[in-house]
């Protein structure tokens, strides 16, 4: 399977499984799961060739583990990053490491200094336990800036953290007082 096909399919899956399932007539349940046969049929109506083998190849090749199959292999979902109102994955609360990281672009710093980290159109702020991962995310948006989040103190102050299946840390928001430039 060539890299371009895998990347294009991953982008398509991100779009329909996180943000706009209705674009292909797909329905997500409250945990974000979609029936694989319905996804394949919706993709075909959209002019996209998609089958179980390609879905499996995308899941295996995606280093960020953005997607997961259900235990019975009949459903698929994005593990985090949803903006769709119908999806509210019930992540278990988790105790974070002392420090987490967030990568962003320099142009967003003024807003972050004023409002903290907010989820925007998504349901959660995404954080990483790894500096390199956070910097990589920041590079997607321009000149990267690495922010350090005092997750231990934030957690002790009563803020909830969750960890998605792929290791991404999630928070509802991160107040300014817990953020510093790394």
Swiss-Prot record:
Record carries keyword Transferase: yes
UniProt keyword list: NAD, Transferase
Cystine bridges: none
MF annotations from Gene Ontology: NAD+ poly-ADP-ribosyltransferase activity; tRNA 2'-phosphotransferase activity
EC number: 2.7.1.-
Any GO BP annotation: tRNA splicing, via endonucleolytic cleavage and ligation
One Pfam family recorded for the sequence: PTS_2-RNA
Keyword NAD on entry: yes
SUPFAM superfamilies according to UniProt: ADP-ribosylation
Transmembrane domains' residue ranges: none
Domain of life: Bacteria
Function: Removes the 2'-phosphate from RNA via an intermediate in which the phosphate is ADP-ribosylated by NAD followed by a presumed transesterification to release the RNA and generate ADP-ribose 1''-2''-cyclic phosphate (APPR>P). May function as an ADP-ribosylase.
UniProt similarity note: Belongs to the KptA/TPT1 family.
Protein name according to UniProt: Probable RNA 2'-phosphotransferase
Species for this entry: Pseudomonas paraeruginosa (strain DSM 24068 / PA7)
Primary gene name: kptA
